[in-house]
Amino acid sequence: MKKITRRSVLKVAAATFTAPFVWKLHAHAAPSETVLHASFGASGMAGSDIGSLTASKNLKLVAVAEVDDARVGDIKKKFPDCVIYKDFRKLLDTEKKLDSVNVSTPDHMHGPIAMRAMNRGLNVYGQKPLTQTIHEARRLTEVAAEKKLVTQMGIQIHSARKHKLVVKLIQDGVIGKVKEVHSWSGKSWGDTAAKPAKNDAVPAGLDWDLWLGVASERPFIAGNYYHPGNWRKRLEFGTGTFGDMGCHILDPVFNAIGVGNPSSIRSELPGPNEYNWSLDVQVKYVFPGSKFTTDTVALTWYNGNARPPKEVVAHIGNLKLDGQGSILIGTEGVMYSQYDSGGQPILLGADKFKDFKMPEMANDNHYLQYVEAVRGTGKTSAPFSYSGPLTEMVLLGCLATRFPKTDLTWDTKALKFTNNDKANAFVKKEYRKGFEVEGL
């Protein structure tokens, strides 16, 4: 942000007039200003995020932190004035005029980088999953609220018409009270093999120590074992298919039924090995009910080769089971939400749906929402106040896969399992010396 204008001060004062005793100036850019932005990550999902954010004429990319020189070529071509760093800490220490950042790195660095940025008062667009641990998600949610920062998690479906239709139809009671949900993804971000006993040369231009970040030291393994494309499979760096796709596919469900965190979780299939997430996952959550559900509601997640049982799939009749999606079973009908295909949810199981007319709803631009919210002219639809608890719920399922055939009872207020101390050891993790983060 270039300066704080009288207009921005008046805007904040008006918005906070009813707050008790004191108010403080937000770090938002005034509507007349350009948002000065930095990206953590330069290619892959980071490149996509950069392209979508800079599509706004009101945001300027001024800096990028990327540990691998081989991944900054496009940035140099498209943004010749952008300053490129390798160390995210140096970027945050050097770039004093920033308003905003996106965190689009491997999962294990989402929380640490986002928290360092937030400690500086910067607004954050954070890729899903918001963090790699439940503790990190809770702390980012808390700090975003304390500092009144603009935040958005990168779950673009949240702003899509078909997502919004799921939420509206469920909350309007179109299928009655939701009693059961089954959601799945055919992706298989896992590995049953042991880690290769290799110590390969680090490629020129890659800072392996910075890539590891908060994780423990280990040799580099060539052949795309970790970097750039398979870190999602590894326990210390990714969150498997569940963490990768759960935040997308469970988002409409979580948003629609409004149940918060589960009271219990159980994983039914073999767990991860010492190094890698499982290929196939089946996890059942039980939630206390909400006004949109029966007294309790069960949600089962499947990924890899796991799928809902035949009696559940029978609800959609002759329709093809999508590669990714959800079936929501209500007291007065069924909703089939397709993630990979289909423009709107399909209503089944009742004659009243034959002539049902879908409400008029439009797609929103998830990225533009964020940019305009930073400028003070709008608000985000997936701020950390929403996406933090969503991430916690997803990560609880990831954690549960470590304890197959075990009923885990969760106390969300205390942020711990009440019946399994071994599981509690995975709620929070220690960071490597030199990468500690205040607040985490």
Residues of each region from the PLM?
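A contiguous active-site-proximal alpha/beta segment in oxidoreductase catalytic domains
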Residues: 123, 131-210
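Hydrophobic residues in well-ordered beta-strands that form the structural core
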Residues: 39, 103, 126, 151-153, ...
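Beta-loop-alpha module in the N-terminal Rossmann-like domain of NAD(P)-dependent dehydrogenases
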Residues: 82-139
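Contiguous beta-strand/loop segments that form the cofactor/metal-binding neighborhood of enzyme cores
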Residues: 164-165, 177, 182-346, 350-385, ...
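Short, solvent-exposed turn/loop segments enriched in Gly/Ser/Thr/Pro and often Arg
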Residues: 68, 104-109, 130-132, 137, ...
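N-terminal Rossmann-like dinucleotide-binding module
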Residues: 13-79, 157-160, 170, 253
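Loop/turn elements at helix/coil->beta-strand transitions in domains of secreted/extracellular proteins
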Residues: 33-35, 59-60, 80-81, 97-100, ...
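N-terminal secretory signal peptides and thylakoid transit peptides that target proteins
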Residues: 1-16
